[in-house]
UniProtKB/Swiss-Prot annotation:
<keyword id="KW-1191">Eukaryotic host transcription shutoff by virus</keyword>
<feature type="binding site">
    <location>
        <position position="80"/>
    </location>
    <ligand>
        <name>Mn(2+) 2</name>
    </ligand>
</feature>
<feature type="binding site">
    <location>
        <position position="119"/>
    </location>
    <ligand>
        <name>Mn(2+) 1</name>
    </ligand>
</feature>
<dbReference type="GO" id="GO:0046872">
    <property type="term" value="F:metal ion binding"/>
</dbReference>
<dbReference type="InterPro" id="IPR037534">
    <property type="entry name" value="INFV_PA"/>
</dbReference>
<dbReference type="GO" id="GO:0075523">
    <property type="term" value="P:viral translational frameshifting"/>
</dbReference>
<comment type="similarity">
    <text>Belongs to the influenza viruses PA family.</text>
</comment>
<dbReference type="GO" id="GO:0042025">
    <property type="term" value="C:host cell nucleus"/>
</dbReference>
<protein>
    <recommendedName>
        <fullName>Polymerase acidic protein</fullName>
        <ecNumber>3.1.-.-</ecNumber>
    </recommendedName>
</protein>
<dbReference type="Pfam" id="PF00603">
    <property type="entry name" value="Flu_PA"/>
</dbReference>
<dbReference type="GO" id="GO:0039523">
    <property type="term" value="P:symbiont-mediated suppression of host mRNA transcription via inhibition of RNA polymerase II activity"/>
</dbReference>
<feature type="binding site">
    <location>
        <position position="108"/>
    </location>
    <ligand>
        <name>Mn(2+) 2</name>
    </ligand>
</feature>
<keyword id="KW-0597">Phosphoprotein</keyword>
<dbReference type="GO" id="GO:0004519">
    <property type="term" value="F:endonuclease activity"/>
</dbReference>
<keyword id="KW-0540">Nuclease</keyword>
<keyword id="KW-0945">Host-virus interaction</keyword>
<dbReference type="GO" id="GO:0006351">
    <property type="term" value="P:DNA-templated transcription"/>
</dbReference>
């Protein structure tokens, strides 16, 4: 390697390199790779400066050798290559004459045109890793960093490369030549592997032993050791990094980073079309319960027994008829299905002993409603691959739907309080540590705020229905089992209550894969007249089945009772998540907890008690066309819970896509509000990605509308 250095580099450069090594107590004859690295670095610094001058007008010009204008001022002052004392003298002189901030470490050059010190780096590793090591060492925004690699890559602070392209190309070509020459002599591998990271003069917390091994094993794939990753993270400067990467891409990539101002974003475009319709697996605000208080009947707790007992509390049954037909369905079949349920329940009551489960007779109306024998026959691919016109099953694009007011009403209703308690506080033992005491206190306060909430009723209803349906799907695969839709709660006085919302009839359920579908028919009681918002009930056939006497301010009034019937379907994986809807409580509690933590860190003490008991304070709940809505801490708890519950009830690919893409836009707007001067490229593409998720889902359309309200008020 020593011979190579003496042949390859100018003798003056070699002499300077040897002198520098001796100054640091290193032997150039032993540490030959270090000698080669210093020579390379010196040569790059000299090439960086060569031919660059400043004319009398203060403009930067390039002057080739032999030009008569030798009296021009050099653009760059070379600091690298001088002995330390002299180098610091030059730096101090520059700082005194230009007013530049004195750097902590000796830089390599000073640029009189841009008035900044420059640190030049030449690396055998990845440019961005070396760049970040340099940035982490220097810790100064005033010193400009410019890194070159032997592979032709480069990286500079804020992607400002200082020199013209031709000058940089000269440097890159020289580095590539050095690499080729080393490789031809078998010296490159040793030279490449000998590079160490930048050493900073600061104490480091050393991780050793097992923890060190685990740390090294846990790194992202591009990093060989913890130090590289630490340097990368500490010095990461996203804007400059992105611009640097863009500049290295093919010329076909023309992504320009545009500044993002208050006037930049436009509202998200919501689709036009007929109003969206209800698509939840069970009725929400429109559900009606037949209830029994303090149940103590024989077989109490067995769903079928409970259902029959609830049905007996109602005396206003009448001959059912269709009041709102399903546009595409055979409505008489829905009517016959309900009549069959009533008849078979009557048969059970006539028996001496009521069975624990009820399998419905496989009548023509139920076979139709449950899609029996409707699935296309599956054929082995080998038996049909010779069919000439074999093609994928054709399906229409989904029809675009517009936002309808009913979904906002549903959400508002979910945030309201009911007159029942839907969750009990579990006994989980005494608190031991102080943190457990704080956790219990928060949980108790939160539970008190949400236990009466309608969203909590939806959770318990969803858990019950999905559990019962999954059990029946596994236990009675071939049967059309009748499954009562039940929930349990306590009254304000603490009395137990069992509620019946209606029935489900399950179809054949040979569910092998998580996504295999089981069909079911749902029949749910309601007092809502479907003719008021027919678009909401597009997927339903609605029957009038009785008259209910209700107490009102003017005495008893009779109201028609309806039955909402529809064919629906679900899968094992959807039922599994439905059974775990209680997680919504945890998610919203965690969101409230982060608000308490923020408050506590400001006040430097736990603020849980004050947070929940200061009834006069209001908190932001969300955006509406009127502005930022505010409410009590209880209202915040219930709103966050309702959002989480609706995310579960209306889960869909459209929601996944909208949440992921709109979050990017939200972060950009948030950065603007925090005065971080965000930049974007292809903002149109981001809007496209957001808007392609707005098709027909009511919950997604409502979220998009809320997002537009947020944009309006956030950017005022």
């Amino acid at each position: 390697m020593e011979d190579f250095v003496r042949q390859c580099f100018n003798p003056m450069i070699v002499e300077l390199a040897e002198k520098a090594m001796k100054e640091y107590g290193e032997d150039p004859k032993i540490e030959t790779n270090k000698l080669a690295a210093i020579c390379t670095h010196l040569e790059v610094c000299f090439m960086y400066s060569d031919f660059h001058f400043i004319n009398e007008q203060g403009e930067s010009i390039i002057v080739e050798l032999g030009d008569p204008n030798a009296l021009l001022k050099h653009r760059f002052e070379i600091i690298e290559g001088r002995d330390r004392t002299m180098a610091w003298t030059v730096v101090n002189s520059i700082c005194n004459t230009t007013g530049a901030e004195k750097p902590k470490f000796l830089p390599d050059l000073y640029d009189y045109k841009e008035n900044r010190f420059i640190e030049i780096g030449v690396t055998r590793r990845e440019v961005h890793i070396y760049y970040l090591e340099k940035a982490n060492k220097i810790k100064s925004e005033k010193t400009h960093i410019h890194i070159f690699s032997f592979t032709g890559e480069e990286m500079a602070t804020k992607a400002d490369y200082t020199l013209d392209e031709e000058s940089r190309a000269r440097i890159k070509t020289r580095l590539f030549t050095i690499r080729q020459e080393m490789a031809s002599r078998g010296l490159w591998d040793s030279f490449r592997q000998s590079e160490r990271g930048e050493e900073t003069i600061e104490e480091k917390f050393e991780i050793t032993g097992t923890m060190r091994k685990l740390a090294d094993q846990s790194l992202p794939p591009n990093f060989s050791c913890l130090e590289n990753f630490r340097a990368y993270v500490d010095g990461f400067e996203p804007n400059g990094y992105i611009e640097g990467k863009l500049s290295q891409m093919s010329k076909e990539v023309n992504a320009r980073i545009e500044p993002f101002f208050k006037t930049t974003p436009r509202p998200i475009r919501l689709p036009d079309g007929p109003p969206c319709s209800q698509r939840s697996k069970f009725l929400l605000m429109d559900a009606l319960k037949l209830s029994i208080e303090d149940p103590s009947h024989e077989g109490e707790g067995i769903p079928l027994y409970d259902a029959i007992k609830c049905m007996r509390t109602f005396f206003g049954w009448k001959e059912p008829y269709v009041v709102k037909p399903h546009e595409k369905g055979i409505n008489p079949n829905y009517l016959l299905s309900w009549k069959q349920v009533l008849a078979e329940l009557q048969d059970i009551e006539n028996e001496e002993k009521i069975p624990k489960t009820k399998n419905m007779k496989k009548t023509s109306q139920l076979k139709w409603a449950l899609g029996e024998n409707m699935a296309p026959e599956k054929v082995d691919f080998d038996d049909c691959k010779d069919v000439s016109d074999l093609k994928q099953y054709y399906s229409d694009e989904p029809e675009l739907r517009s936002l309808s007011s009913w979904i906002q009403n549903e959400f508002n209703k979910a945030c309201e309080l009911t007159d029942s308690v839907w969750i009990e506080l579990d006994e989980i033992g005494e608190d031991v540590a102080p943190i457990e005491h704080i956790a219990s206190m928060r949980r108790n306060y939160f539970t008190a705020e949400v236990s009466h909430c309608r969203a909590t009723e939806y959770i318990m209803k969803g858990v019950y229905i999905n559990t019962a349906l999954l059990n029946a799907s596994c236990a009675a695969m071939d049967d059309f089992q009748l499954i009562p839709m039940i929930s349990k709660c306590r009254t304000k006085e603490g009395r137990r209550k069992t509620n019946l919302y209606g029935f489900i009839i399950k179809g054949r359920s040979h569910l092998r894969n998580d996504t295999d579908v089981v069909n079911f028919v749902s029949m749910e009681f309601s007092l809502t007249d479907p003719r008021l918002e027919p678009h909401k009930w597009e997927k339903y056939c609605v029957l009038e089945i009785g008259d209910m006497l209700l107490r009102s301010a003017i005495g008893q009034v009779s109201r028609p009772m309806f039955l909402y019937v529809r064919t629906n379907g679900t899968s094992k994986i959807k039922m599994k998540w439905g059974m775990e809807m209680r997680r919504c409580l945890l998610q919203s509690l965690q969101q409230i907890e982060s608000m308490i933590e923020a408050e506590s860190s400001v006040k430097e003490k736990d603020m849980t008690k004050e947070f929940f008991e200061n009834k006069s304070e209001t908190w932001p709940i969300g955006e509406s066309p009127k502005g930022v809505e505010e409410g009590s801490i209880g209202k915040v708890c219930r709103t966050l819970l309702a959002k989480s519950v609706f995310n579960s009830l209306y889960a869909s690919p459209q929601l996944e896509g909208f949440s992921a893409e709109s979050r990017k836009l939200l972060l950009i707007v948030q950065a603007l509000r925090d005065n971080l001067e965000p930049g974007t490229f292809d903002l149109g593409g981001l809007y496209e990605a957001v808007e392609e998720c707005l098709i027909n889902d009511p919950w997604v359309l409502l979220n998009a509308s809320w997002f537009n309200s947020f944009l309006t008020h956030a950017l005022r």
